[in-house]
Amino acid sequence: MSFMLALPKISLHGAGAIGDMVKLVAGKQWGKALIVTDGQLVKLGLLDSLFSALDEQQMAYQLFDEVFPNPTEALVQQGYAAYQAARCDYLIAFGGGSPIDTAKAIKILTANPGPSTAYSGVGKVKNAGVPLVAINTTAGTAAEMTSNAVIIDSERQVKEVIIDPNLIPDIAVDDASVMLDIPPAVTAATGMDALTHAIEAFVSVGAHPLTDANALEAIRLINLWLPKAVEEGHDLQAREQMAFGQYLAGMAFNSAGLGLVHALAHQPGATHNLPHGVCNAILLPIIENFNRPNAVARFARVAEAMGVDTRGMSDEAASMEAINAIRTLSKRVGIPQGFSQLGVSKADIEGWLDKALADPCAPCNPRPASRDEVRELYLEAL
């Protein structure tokens, strides 16, 4: 077996990591930064430590704070225009998956013809573009350290998944001190996204020993610490442990790939502007139960990682307990239990089927699915 591991050149972790990053970048003399973020994060004061550190080092920057959830190609073009107008030299993304994915797409345009969605698929970005620093505020998408970006093509109403090592940030930052004020609902959704990353990577056809180790530890940490991070958001230990867990999950899926959960979740996210983590969380137990017959022994290990006492159980019984444990965690952190609660109807499903099957995440799923089977999975998730 041969496989590739692609990671950021530098990763910084722990409270105070933002200040450490600024000192590091100051020595590189990259020039002027475009800070790509969400205006709400600016209003909450979450970027104050970054601004202060940059000002202290007398480092030039321009703020672009127009990012919204589920970013579109139009937003990417707007951000790239801001980058050009301010004569910037590199990018700093601050936020969760949406700001970081937007910055990754802008990075593409700094060295390749647009639009960024033209690079949907695997390995199509020819030139790396300018340096990118990614400061993560959620736990999480792991966008700060992965090769993935997801941008909506508004005309086609589809999430275009761009996967290329050239998108991996040069520096990844996970500073739990800026995660303390993330609302419970966002904490829950992003945490379940991270769990989805870990489980899909572990049962992926691309899994290997290095991704297995990262995925199992990620599952253990997320199952243990997500409820506390949701219920007691200012608990720094819970936030740090979730940051570690989601990063390990990112290390796993960045090499092993994902699966049908993400392939199906991308579609309601695109057409109904639903939170990505919520879509994943709703689909996760349903699709993994569909996958279970093809990976019984692996799901038994997922159950162990989620704290199930599997002693004396057959792998078959333990694998079913893994699905139950996923459902239990999802309910505990307040995830809606079906898409119908979010305005989705049966009529919406037909338009998603072909797009889900064509999604770049689908090929790594341990069990192939037909169009009819995808329809049934969506119906079960209503």
Regions found by a protein language model. Name each.
Residues 1-64, 381:
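An N-terminal, well-structured beta->alpha segment
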Residues 42-115, 123, 228-239:
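N-terminal small/polar loop signature for handling phosphorylated ligands or for N-terminal nucleophile
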Residues 111-207, 298-305:
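A glycine/threonine-rich phosphate-anchoring loop and its flanking beta-alpha core
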Residues 140, 247-280, 359-363:
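Glycine-rich phosphate/pyrophosphate-binding beta-alpha loops
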Residues 184-248, 252:
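C-terminal and late-domain segments of enzyme folds
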Residues 271-348:
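Gly/Pro-rich interdomain helix-loop hinge
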Residues 345-382:
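Short, amphipathic C-terminal "tail helix"
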